[in-house]
Amino acid sequence: MAAKDVKFGDSARKKMLVGVNVLADAVKATLGPKGRNVVLAKSFGAPTITKDGVSVAKEIELKDAFENMGAQLVKEVASKANDAAGDGTTTATVLAQAIVNEGLKAVAAGMNPMDLKRGIDKATAAIVAELKNLSKPCADSKAIAQVGTISANSDNSIGEIIAEAMEKVGKEGVITVEEGSGLENELSVVEGMQFDRGYLSPYFVNKPDTMVAELEGPLLLLVDKKISNIRELLPVLEAVAKAGRPLLIVAEDVEGEALATLVVNNMRGIVKVAAVKAPGFGDRRKAMLQDIATLTGGQVISEEIGLSLETATLEHLGNAKRVILSKENTTIIDGAGADGDIEARVKQIRAQIEETSSDYDREKLQERLAKLAGGVAVIKVGAGTEVEMKEKKARVEDALHATRAAVEEGVVPGGGVALVRALAAIADLKGDNEEQNVGIALLRRAVEAPLRQITANAGDEPSVVADKVKQGSGNFGYNAATGEYGDMIEMGILDPAKVTRSALQAAASIGGLMITTEAMVADLPEDKPAAGMPDMGGMGGMGGMM
């Protein structure tokens, strides 16, 4: 085991503070409408330019082990805020820096760190409750666009495209962000349920100009196993041919003679048919087949529930207005499922989302929910260069998280004003002793930090602006983009309440823990001996000289 270096008391805290300040100073340069960019070198490819706090924080590693511990703890603040609300990482970092700096001054003056932390926790709980009171629901498209614009660093086009996407697919709908090929941002919306499986044979194509298979008013046969024997399929095929309607088969796979027979029947026009693999794998495939069954009013033919292909009848098949199959995707439009069944299925998926602890599972469940409840919107980000594309895509993703958070918990006045207004909740708050009161006072000063930093980044005097904002009331604040004072809500400067709340909670949690640090342990750097001189090698080829 490697030897360790241990530091105690003030010498440990001073080192930690250096790391905190290095990381926070790099991150806080990006805050506000006039925040600057940070350039990150990559081990391969072009450098990345970003204004996203958590991206900057993730890149920072310091050489000194004790300083690096401080930096890593603040990085954790940014990550926690990002995980909770998807935005507000820079605000969280600025708050954490202010709490740690103020707190360590109090500890150096002889205050008890544990009581300081208790005071900070009390004040944080009161401010969080006040933020909930201050928040107003984010109901209309205009408010959603404003939140998106502010989060995307005052880029109106991003705010507007997100509001448009939410209007089209609903607030529950899935909105994905992709890299576009043009200069402008584009929005495309997929109506109905789409999954990423295409036709099993190009011979199913009936629109050769676009290479798609389109079935009007089809029946859907949903099977949770492989189909390779055509005999199993014959009863259903005959019934469908008599009904004179097209058929879409969704199964684990269709292969061999079964696929060949379907292709031949389709080409001869005996029965209009297409086949596609079921989406997903394992249990997720079963769940998605059940989703399609609910959407189309059919039943999954599964031996688990005592149904087999030979006994399947037209009653077991689903119905839809139209199905479009391309090489990569299948879209089911206007399924004939009962609204009550679809709602029950949506409720069930929502309950699973609440219970799951895995981010991956949650994302997949939300995709399933959107396919049932709304649709899927794709925002294609346009830019002039690859570097700008990456920077812009990160901003769009941030703005999307912010708007979702706003829809969830409402909005508060932006620009750091909400935190200043929430101070009213701790104006008369008292701790159990004098040192807890110092912790409460410390947080009172720290929550002004985001407002002061936004002002400093805009090139104005933080103390003057903070003073004037504190003298005002309600939504009165400072618009750093224009240098004007006024009603923040009317000026369209909104923050999601969830983002502000998560930023403060993450900062207070980790800031409080750092104040109570008394010892730090790190690996000692290994002293590697200098490499010796390489040998000269043999003097080959010089034989015969003697």
Swiss-Prot record:
Reaction catalysis annotation: ATP + H2O + a folded polypeptide = ADP + phosphate + an unfolded polypeptide
EC number in record: 5.6.1.7
UniProtKB keywords: ATP-binding, Chaperone, Cytoplasm, Isomerase, Nucleotide-binding, Stress response
Gene Ontology BP terms: protein refolding
Residues annotated as binding ATP: 30-33, 51, 87-91, 415, 479-481, 495
GO CC, one annotated term: cytoplasm
Name of one Pfam family that matches: Cpn60_TCP1
Example of a GO MF term: ATP-dependent protein folding chaperone
Catalytic class of the enzyme: isomerase
SUPFAM superfamilies attached to this UniProt entry: GroEL apical domain-like, GroEL equatorial domain-like, GroEL-intermediate domain like
Cellular localization per UniProt: Cytoplasm
Major subcellular location class: cytoplasm
Top-level lineage group: Bacteria
HAMAP family linked to this entry: CH60
Family of this protein: Belongs to the chaperonin (HSP60) family.
Entry function: Together with its co-chaperonin GroES, plays an essential role in assisting protein folding. The GroEL-GroES system forms a nano-cage that allows encapsulation of the non-native substrate proteins and provides a physical environment optimized to promote and accelerate protein folding.
Quaternary structure note: Forms a cylinder of 14 subunits composed of two heptameric rings stacked back-to-back. Interacts with the co-chaperonin GroES.
Protein name, as recorded: Chaperonin GroEL
Organism of this sequence: Pseudomonas entomophila (strain L48)
Name of the coding gene: groEL
